[in-house]
Amino acid sequence: MWLKALIISFAVTAAFEPILIPFLHRLKFGQTILEDGPVWHKKKQGTPTMGGIGFILAVTVASMFFLRDVHDAIMLLCGVLFGLVGFFDDYIKVIKKHNQGFTAKQKFTLQTIASLLYAIYMYLFVGQTKTLVPFLGARIDLGILYVPFVMLVLLATTNSANLTDGLDGLASGVGATVALFFCA
């Protein structure tokens, strides 16, 4: 089911991004490069930013057709919250015409709030406290430790993607890998 949503969102993104990127370029929604950065980054000045809008919209709309219950909707909402953090981070960069949006502390705080809300929801309303140990097939009941565990997984996954992401559309490959992880 989630694989269908992933395939549809990939197709929509592949069709929509070639329209969105030139539009963002015309709006001058481009990346600002620091003067004290590496010399080879100078040529990347003005590279369109906020391309994640198309990806987040495509994933959200495609996923909405496959929601089975409120739990799926809450999981999707968590992803949208993380996407909004990225959107506003990029938006601040564009408005300030500087490469600094949120500070690392601000971004991490917002991500922590989103992951905490999702983890608490899973613990209190779904009653989920077990996790599957990869390659062993065993389930471990973490009890209340499920909350920080879920937070750690969400924060580690999203920030790994953020750290890997660059300026030249690397997020699409990283994003697809992360999406496959969440579909599993």
What spans do the regions from the language model cover?
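"…together with the soluble PPM/PP2C metallo-phosphatase catalytic core" -> "…together
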Residues: 1-184
